A protein has these predicted regions:
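RNase H-like (RuvC/DEDD) metal-dependent nuclease/polynucleotide-processing core
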Residues: 2-9, 13-292
Length: 292
């Protein structure tokens, strides 16, 4: 057990090119069963930037209380491939984040586009066209366990092509996490460091919450659908009078309630398959491998 939390925050993330991103949404809920709420961007008529998310997290954590914060991106890369970036075999996820930052420091707004273009790191990525012959996209243990559990089919962080690609979001997320840790000593990133008494950042996969509750692969298209999902997560429903929600809104709202719901299961912090490599290098999707 890692103790109790005072708030649950979920971020639907984006690693896209550009200045602002319709794909970013943030939701928050407190303990108990109250409905999650969407957090408006600082310029309410304009979408979030990644830097604004960093600033908001820094501010929100500074308001006090202990938050469990889930971000929908891979926190690391498969080290069967990523280990080749380092001369020493003792490299950790924090070494990887430092490397990504050095390579991408000229990319604005935490973008990670320079990394897969760099000749020393490009070979593991599928970036365009047909899949190169012989290319095996690395996967982390958590992605394999998630598939075996039947709680989703997360893509490899080395895939940078197609609607379901997650690689750009992962690289941007690593830059975000690194920057936040440099600003604050009262946050921890699970499972890489001790979390007791600190606000804790975890990697999330929104579909997992729906799969674990029995909602399955159905889309959440309406407020009525969303409130049905929230009920399965022991959460009150949201006000259904607003315009039709976006996929990003529903992912964030479901995930905030899902974090609160899943956190009641003590086994979520010591899931089956969470080995030494995952704890030191590759990370883990929160909820994967946890007992039902």
């Amino acid at each position: 057990m890692t103790g109790s939390f005072d708030g649950f925050i979920a971020i639907d993330w984006s690693g896209a090119t550009g200045k602002r991103y319709q794909g970013i949404a943030i939701a928050e809920c407190g303990p108990g069963n109250g409905a999650p709420i969407l957090i408006s961007p600082p310029e309410s008529n304009r979408p979030w930037t990644r830097t604004q998310v960093l600033e908001w997290l820094d501010w929100r954590i500074g308001q006090g209380g202990r938050s469990l914060i889930g971000i929908d991106c891979a926190f690391s890369l498969p080290f069967d491939t990523a280990a080749s970036y380092f001369q020493q075999d003792t490299a950790t996820v924090f070494d990887l984040w430092d490397l990504v930052e050095r390579v991408c420091q000229a990319d604005l707004d935490l973008f990670g586009g320079a990394f897969p273009r760099h000749p020393a790191h490009a070979s593991g990525y599928w970036t365009s066209g047909a899949r190169p012959e012989g290319l095996v996209l690395g996967r982390r243990a958590t992605e394999d366990v998630c598939r075996a559990d039947g709680t989703g089919s997360p893509e490899s962080p080395y895939k940078l092509i197609g609607a379901k690609q997650v690689g750009k979001g992962a690289l941007a997320g690593m830059r975000l996490l690194r920057a936040l840790r440099l600003r604050r000593d009262d946050v921890a990133v699970w499972p890489f460091e001790p979390t007791e008494g600190r606000s804790t950042l975890v990697e999330i996969y929104p579909r997992l919450f729906l799969m674990r509750t029995g909602w399955g692969l159905r889309k959440v298209r309406t407020w009525s659908d969303l409130n049905g999902c929230l009920a399965l997560l022991d959460s009150d429903g949201v006000d259904a009078s607003a315009p039709v929600p976006t996929d990003h809104d529903t992912d964030a709202l479901v995930s905030a309630a899902g974090l609160r719901w899943l956190c009641r299961n003590p086994g979520v912090w010591s899931p089956a398959g969470l080995n030494e490599r995952a704890q030191r290098q590759e990370g883990w999707i929160f909820g994967v491998g946890a007992p039902h």
